[in-house]
């Protein structure tokens, strides 16, 4: 099995550089003092995101670690797949929510965690669960998780800077040589840029993880079946449209929000389920 971590390491580096440059540039718009503070903040943000990417997603989903006694099937499947891929065993978590979904997080295979919701464990059979876990492990082995978390952090920073720019433009844009027109531009374009970044990074990752996961398990049709069930299950039991969950939606195997909800459409980071299923069925046909 061939993994593709090197290209994603480069993308991660470029995103971190871009996030730092953006923070410093927006700091300059607020004036000299803000520029110095922004530079310090950029360094701190990079360090924090790198070492805490796993904790952010697990905390947002209220995920709890589980032992092999608590989740024997999950442990058995993950151990078999990790051994087959010659990779370390990740930490396993369960999130007690009816919303059917799963995600992986962590900056590298040795610091990875895989989480399933109780909802997905309830609706999938073991063959389908194996396919979903293979998909999530593929994210880990391809180093998708770090780039995804960095992209999410970058999007969050852009949104925060846009909010700061809006308030600064309203209540003090002329102090310390701040440029009110530039602040207004940041406020208007920031949320759009944040959404585009999430979508651009996440959609291509999902197709690749579908393919890599199907090769790892040798069963693309099982993943197609799982995606059908998850898609239907999300319509019946979506995650609540809360900002902290929306910021982690790009990590999930499928969009966790009900179709048509404002937050679900705004933060849609996944390719259409129908397209993913068609690709998997074509893969099964050879």
Curated annotation (Swiss-Prot):
**CDD domains in alphabetical order:** M48B_HtpX_like
Which InterPro entries does the UniProt record give? HtpX_protease, Pept_M48_protease_HtpX, Peptidase_M48
What enzyme category does the UniProt record give? Answer: hydrolase
Coiled-coil ranges per UniProt: none
Enzyme nomenclature, EC number: 3.4.24.-
* GO CC annotation, single: plasma membrane
Major localization listed first in the record, in broad terms: membrane
Q: Where would you find this protein in the cell?
A: Cell membrane
Positions binding Zn(2+) in this chain are 135, 139, 206
Cofactor(s) this protein requires = Zn(2+)
**GO biological process terms held by the UniProt record:** proteolysis
**Molecular function (GO) terms listed?**
metalloendopeptidase activity; zinc ion binding
Uses described in the biotechnology field:
Mice immunized with recombinant bacteria carrying a DNA vaccine encoding HtpX were significantly protected from challenge with M.tuberculosis, indicating this might be a good vaccine candidate.
Which topology term describes how it sits in the membrane? Multi-pass membrane protein
Q: How is the cofactor bound?
A: Binds 1 zinc ion per subunit.
Sequence similarity: Belongs to the peptidase M48B family.
Matching PANTHER family: PROTEASE HTPX (PTHR43221:SF1)
NCBIfam families in alphabetical order: PRK03072.1
**Name assigned to this protein:** Protease HtpX homolog
Q: In the UniProt record, what gene is named as encoding this protein?
A: htpX
């Amino acid at each position: 099995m061939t993994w593709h971590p090197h290209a994603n390491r480069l993308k991660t580096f470029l995103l971190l550089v871009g996030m730092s440059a953006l923070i410093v540039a927006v700091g300059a718009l607020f004036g000299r003092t803000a520029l110095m503070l922004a530079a310090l903040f950029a360094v701190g943000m990079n360090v924090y995101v790198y070492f805490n990417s796993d904790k952010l997603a697990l905390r947002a989903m209220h995920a709890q670690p589980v032992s092999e006694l608590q989740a024997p099937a999950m442990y058995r499947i993950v151990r078999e797949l990790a051994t087959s891929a010659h990779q370390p065993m990740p930490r396993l978590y369960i999130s007690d929510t009816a919303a059917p979904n799963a995600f992986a997080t962590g900056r590298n295979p040795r610091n990875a965690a895989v989480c399933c919701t109780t909802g997905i464990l309830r609706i999938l059979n073991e063959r389908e669960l194996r396919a979903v876990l293979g998909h999530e492990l593929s994210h880990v082995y391809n180093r998708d998780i770090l780039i995804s978390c960095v992209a999410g952090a970058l999007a969050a920073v852009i949104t925060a800077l846009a909010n700061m720019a809006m308030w600064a433009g309203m209540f003090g844009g002329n102090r310390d040589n701040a440029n009110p027109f530039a602040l207004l531009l940041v406020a208007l374009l920031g949320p759009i840029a944040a959404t585009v970044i999430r979508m651009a990074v996440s959609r291509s990752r999902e197709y690749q993880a579908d393919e890599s996961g199907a090769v790892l398990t040798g069963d693309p049709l099982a993943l197609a079946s799982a995606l059908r069930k998850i898609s239907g299950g999300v319509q019946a039991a979506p995650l609540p449209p809360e900002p902290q969950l929306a910021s982690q939606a790009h990590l999930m195997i499928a969009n966790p929000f009900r179709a048509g909800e404002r937050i679900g459409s705004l933060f849609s980071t996944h390719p259409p389920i129908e397209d993913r299923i068609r690709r998997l069925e074509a893969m099964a046909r050879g």
